[in-house]
Amino acid sequence: MDVKECIGKGLLQRVPPNRELSAKEWREAELDMAEAKALLKEKRLKRSTTTSYYAMFHAAKAVLFKLGFREKAHYAIAVVLEDLAKRGKLEMRFADDFRAAMHAREGADYHYSYSEETARSLVSIAGEFVTEMKKLYRE
């Protein structure tokens, strides 16, 4: 599926770019990133896993608002990230990392599948992802 198909299926909407909504998403991304690290230290692995994903989710949403998109499904964010990668604006690994984090979050929430290794890896990946989204946002 591509961006046009996501729009056609109602998974993504075109909206006017909105810096105010982007700023709110950045605040949430930063809060979630700090919380994911703290949860990992406390060995609260399920919550660290899910919160790392949400740090990525909010950072990506900040970029989407700048680009003039509002997501109606988490999957649509991955599609936009892949589109950005195909256009040379983002390394494909960040789109892949987002998808992997999305699956890890779903595993933790719905299948009670999580581990210290996954939580530790996601905290690291989320930190890199948020940093990369900030670079992309500034372009």
Give residue ranges: language-model regions.
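Terminal alpha-helical segments
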Residues: M1-E139
